[in-house]
Amino acid sequence: MEQLKTPQNQKTRPRNMLPKKKGKELKKRPCKVKRKLFGSENIRPNKKIPLASDVDNELEKKRGSMIRKRSETDLCPDPSVTDLLCHESLTVSPKFERDGLSACTEFENFMDTRKIVLSRNEKSVTDLSAHYPVLCNLGIFERIHSPFLFSIHIDTQSFSVVYVPHKESSCSQFCEPEKNMARILGSGSYGMVYDLNNVAIKASDDLESCISSYVSGVVRAKAGAQLTSRECVFKSLLICNSVCLNHKISLSKTYDTDLYKFTDWKLENVENYYSIFCNLAEAVRFLNMVCKINHCDISLANILIHHKEGIILEAVLADYSLAEVHPQYNGKCGILRQFDHRIQIVPKSYNKLCDMFNPGFRPMIAHKIILVEVYAEFDGKGNPVRHCNLDLCALAQVFLLCVIRMLDERGCREAQKYYENRLFTYSNEACTLNPIKYPLEYKDACCKVLAEHLVLFGILFYREVVDMFENLYDFLHASGDLSVRDLLEETYVNDSRDVRRQPIRYRHAQLQRHEIGQILLNDLQQLLSIITISDLEKDPYSVFRV
């Protein structure tokens, strides 16, 4: 144990120091981590996003943008409800096992309303397998081409079940992309992403396939798609339009690039960018307020775009590997898998803040809570508004970096090196730490990320940043953690001294004089200023509206 001292020479609690690795330096790449905080010995960092300096030599390469990260949930649900077997074979049950006309009428009504009401028959409400003659019905799968949500009602209980069809033709065509000479778009701990004739083929694990299938079915149904729809973009959300749960393969469409790699920012296109930002904000609102799903991994790399000459033609939010249903729906959401006739419950949502978001894009309020309690859960209070605003705050961190890139007179590449590299270096430090083994060190890493968020906030909002800093400083002081309080102050003061506003001052003034620019800055400030729980109660529809 080593006794540490604060800059004011105050003694703090002893810390377990990290073991030093000889001959290895930390790779300077921002990353995200999805950890199993309970009952897992297999804790691995996920794919990292390179710093600007790391990709300079690759600018000439045409890269795909389907960059994904692997999902690992914290805990499995109760084993009794994880896999509910549907004992009836789909191949021998084309219709309801009831009397002729009434059964046919009931089936058609089910397909029209996408709802079915069942009697409990003195069974547990979670034992959906008791109703397999109705649920596992070949006629349902024959009517859909992509994952689709159906509501199951048993007495007063309701379940959201996404039917996932299995197409042998797609399986033979896409489930062995290496043999089909598919081009590699990206790779990581989640597996590989390939491009085969503009079809993005993603290989993942069972848990990620489950949550991705569920999100796909819910978004498709809530957006009002037809049962036969094969589209994979709804409300600016990119979802898979086909899933093979046998081989853990999902299909969607490819895009030109992602926001991290996009460098052609131009101030004269600010109206176009604001419109795109509004569409992305609407995607977050739809996902949370309508679908009751937290994205939990909004970042530059997870926003895919088509663009031409500095104009963003289309932008979509992608990658649901870390997505979680709002906790009040735990145990009530699942997927019905045609290929093996099983109902699989969607993994339980624990809402652990240290498991949510890339640390570099994590909302400041989340970092603030982590600095007091590393294992804290996000308290959504069963209110989708809080969950929605949390995702919007992460989206605002993305927009902040985009605006800074647009305003830097030296160009986007210099802006990335000058303003982003330190943030992503701190973020990487947090990614490489296991908060269970090294909770104090993880806190310190998050503290430095939070300080850098304040520095970048002050680049655009230099008058408001003082109040923000003092609010956070006083909060940490009241919590009694003097070492973290002083680390925040030291990092913020030192990093602020190193960063100049000069490269963005002229264009920043131009943006402030532009009508849409004023609205953009105002909306951005409102979201970035959310640093208390009460702030999360604000109307999520009040910002970034076309």
Swiss-Prot record:
EC code(s) of this entry: 2.7.1.-
Pfam families linked: UL97 (PF06734)
Function: Phosphorylates the antiviral nucleoside analog ganciclovir.
Catalytic residues as annotated in Swiss-Prot or TrEMBL: D297
Protein name: Probable ganciclovir kinase
Family membership: Belongs to the protein kinase superfamily. Tyr protein kinase family. HCMV ganciclovir subfamily.
Stretches of the chain forming a coiled coil according to its record: none
Domain of life: Viruses
Listed Polar residues bias regions: 1-11
Keywords per UniProt: ATP-binding, Early protein, Kinase, Nucleotide-binding, Transferase
Residues holding ATP: L185, G186, S187, G188, S189, Y190, G191, M192, V193, K202
Residue segments, region Disordered: 1-29
Signal peptide residues on this chain, from the entry's feature table: none
Gene Ontology MF: a single term: protein kinase activity
Biased composition (Basic residues): 12-29
